[in-house]
Amino acid sequence: MASTASIRLLTSFVGAASLLGSATCSSSGAHDVANAAPTGKNIGVNVSTINTWDGSRPFMNLIYGSSWQSRDPSGAGRDVEVSQLDSAGWVKSLPAGYQATRTLYGVADADVICRWQGNDHGSMRVVVNESEVRQTRMRGANELRFRYSLRSPHDPPLPSIRYTVDPADYVRNLDCREADAKPGVLFDPTFLRTIDGFSVIRFMKWQAAVEANTAVNWAGRNTPSSGDYLGKDGVPVELMVSLANEVGADPWFAMPWNADDDYVARFARYVRDNLAPGRRVYVEVSNEVWNGSYAVMRQAQREGVAEGLDNSDGEYGQAMARYAEKTRQVMGIWSKVFDGQSDRLVRVASAQNVSPFWSERILAHGDTAASIDALATAPYWELGDDEARGKSLDDIMSHSLPAKIAETLDWAKKQKAVAAKYGKRYIAYEGGQHVWLNNNQPLVAQIERDPRMYNLYKSYIGRWNRDIGDTMALFALTGGIGKAGFGLVEYAGQPVSEAPKMRAVRESFAQSRR
């Protein structure tokens, strides 16, 4: 996902050459998109970042929305240091007088049971706003029961669990869930109902090492029994594949730029061997390497310059050449793993939607086109502070945003032509509205919740399917509203009647089944 500012910055950075590769977009037809019949068969979704506050609780275990912190004797909190964790991410030691603490997801009026292995010496407590909640410790067992009710999906305070760490037998395998939930269930049923029906799930936001641009290897990766899914490489591949299988969707993964070849190969083998028959996997290298706001683009540029790659398009061109080179390397590994099963693999190269020039450069570099199956961009219809200034809500909903839909999909058609030139599919790794106002958050909320957003999404999906006709992974499943509001729903389980974007998507699913 690119912010409005970063898109403008990059368009300026790449220079006029990128815009000369295609004719100027027309905004004609800004009001005729509603005439296109939408279909949901191509519509996927991006999952949102794992945290306790965005309105999405994917996992039954309530601990997996946060990371460990320590609390000193004065009550001050700080992040737990890596040296204080064991190899699986459980707190193994803290200074004297400190406690380990972990924020839990809030639940709506439920009894919760926490179970664990190890010795907490009777110190395990649940607190909300520094006050202990009513709780019961089961005699002779590592089990604590408490009751909690979240007033609303975005209404803190959230519960936290605290305990003393015994280095000789520290707490591990901590599991907190509703008392009536089965111990082995992985995913929250409300989350499953919210994500059900999408054809593709793009997991980039769950793969922590992608946007963090950190080095990962297979031996140091997270596993389902790890104590934290926010660090290292993020949510374990086992859980992402399990989710795709459970809801009947094709997974879309991003390989971290700094993952070694062994990690990439083992990841690919796990997917090959465990993804349900009939399902396909989409794979790309990192996320938005074209975007100068991200560390991965700057690394690609440094590497491209250091390798002495073609500099006829400047250092940015060297970054894109390095991206093409890296894409060939990673896709070569996946292709080898899926030898004989290539129909289950979709290899993706991504580019900026408004720059067909660079899409062409990437595909034409070396034999990159032969190493991929699809070109992807993110056809957002964006509105920033400058576009919104002085305009009424009616102006924005009735004129500005419909024109933006037409403009971005005109660019998408140019990208489709580039892909077709090389015999490749054209798809979208992200998409949807991209309203980002730094100075008028109340207006953002009005726009996102306006009933006319339903018609805009219906129009957008309809024209995408009419003019493009391939996969789009909308951004994103859930999320609250601030300077932006990308969530199709503000929280998992939000009634569709209150979520105009999701209502349009759900209706497209229903129409595709007719």
Please tell me what each predicted stretch does.
Residues 25-285, 290-399, 405, 409-435, ...:
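Non-catalytic accessory regions flanking glycosidase/transglycosidase catalytic cores in CAZymes
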Residues 1-13:
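Bacterial N-terminal signal peptides that target proteins for export
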